[in-house]
Design a protein with these regions (language model features):
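Active-site PLP attachment segment
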Residues: 104-135, 150-157
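PLP-dependent aspartate aminotransferase-fold enzymes
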Residues: 1-49
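Conserved PLP-binding catalytic core of the aspartate aminotransferase-like
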Residues: 179-182, 192-231
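Amphipathic alpha-helix from the class-I
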Residues: 153-172, 211-215, 255-258
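PLP-dependent enzyme catalytic core of the Aspartate aminotransferase-like
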Residues: 166-168, 176, 234-276
Length: 276
C-alpha cells in the first residue's frame, strides 16, 4: 500500500510489481457507486474476485463515504458473490473500537489491520468470515506464514493496546476533540478568506485548500498544494509539525487535550492570514 506518499508520482504502484497485477486490478473513483456497478457489469461479476476499499479514505487526505455508499457496495457484493474487503489499516480501532465497520454498521467479508493494532510496533493482521479463514492452512489449502508472524513482542504490545482501548473507551472524547478542531479550523480559514474543505471522522482529520465538495481523488487533485506548502512551513515555524503532504490525513491521540487543539487552531489562524 504506497499511500499518499506516491499519490502524485503517476505510477501504478512500485517498480518490481508485475504488469499483470495492474492489468488485473481496476481502479474506481471512491464514492461512485454507479460507475462501480457499471464496471462490474462490464467485466462480469464472475470475473471479479473482490472489491477492496478503505471505508474511510485516508490515503488521499481524508475523504468520508457518502451516505449510502458503503451499504451500496455491501449490497452489490452480497448480490453478486464478490468478496468485500475493508482496508482498516487506518480506521481499525481508531474511529471506533470495532473500526469503521462498527461505526457505519457495514460488515465486510475480510478486513486488514495495522497501525493501532500494533501498539507502536510493526503488526499486520487480517480476518473475516469463518468459511474464508478456514481456507488457510492447516485447515485449508492456502499457505500463509512469515518469519516474524505472531512475533511475541509485537503481539503483547498489540493486545495491551486493544485492551486499553476497550477498558478506557476514549472514543467519545476523541470525537469531541475532532469536532473542536474542525470548528476551529473552519473559523481560521474563514477569517483568512481561504476556501477550504475541513472534516473529521473520530480522531482522523482532513483539510483541503479546496472549496469543495471533496468526495473522490479527482476532486482531491484540485486542492491548492502551493498554499498548503506555505501553510506547512508556517505551521512548522510556529512549532506545530504536520504531515508534509497535502494528501495526508491528520490524527488526534488520547494525549491531546482541548488546550492543544486550541493552540493548533490559533496558530493556524495566524499562519493562514500570513500566507494566504
Amino acid at each position: 500500500m504506497p499511500g499518499s506518499g506516491v499519490a502524485t508520482f503517476g505510477i501504478s504502484g512500485s517498480p518490481g510489481v508485475p504488469d499483470d497485477i495492474a492489468r488485473n486490478t481496476v481502479s474506481i473513483e471512491y464514492n461512485d457507486l454507479e460507475v462501480l456497478q457499471q464496471t462490474v457489469n462490464g467485466i462480469g461479476a464472475d470475473q471479479v474476485a473482490a472489491i477492496i476499499l478503505e471505508p474511510v479514505a485516508g490515503n488521499m487526505g481524508l475523504v468520508l463515504p457518502n451516505e449510502g455508499f458503503l451499504q451500496g457496495v455491501r449490497d452489490l457484493c452480497s448480490t453478486t458473490g464478490i468478496l468485500l474487503i475493508f482496508d482498516e489499516v487506518m480506521t481499525g480501532f481508531r474511529v471506533a473500537l470495532g473500526g469503521a465497520q462498527e461505526r457505519f454498521g457495514i460488515t465486510p467479508d475480510l478486513s486488514t489491520y495495522s497501525k493501532v493494532i500494533g501498539g507502536g510496533l510493526p503488526v499486520g493482521a487480517f480476518g473475516g468470515r469463518a468459511d474464508l479463514m478456514a481456507q488457510l492452512a492447516p485447515s485449508g489449502p492456502v499457505y500463509q506464514a512469515g518469519t516474524l508472524s505472531g512475533n511475541p513482542l509485537a503481539m503483547t504490545a498489540g493486545l495491551a493496546t486493544v485492551r486499553h482501548l476497550r477498558d478506557t473507551d476514549p472514543y467519545d472524547r476523541l470525537e469531541a476533540l475532532g469536532s473542536r478542531w474542525v470548528a476551529g479550523m473552519k473559523q481560521a480559514t474563514a477569517d483568512a478568506g481561504v476556501a477550504a474543505t475541513i472534516s473529521h471522522c473520530g480522531s482522523m482529520l482532513g483539510m483541503y485548500f479546496h472549496p469543495g465538495p471533496v468526495t473522490n481523488y479527482s476532486q482531491v487533485q484540485g486542492a491548492d498544494t502551493a498554499l498548503f506548502q506555505r501553510y506547512f512551513r508556517g505551521m512548522l515555524d510556529a512549532g506545530i509539525y504536520l504531515a508534509p503532504s497535502a494528501f495526508e490525513a491528520g490524527f488526534i491521540s488520547t494525549t491531546h487535550t482541548e488546550q492543544l487543539i486550541d493552540q493548533t487552531t490559533a496558530a493556524a489562524a495566524k499562519v493562514l492570514k500570513d500566507v494566504a
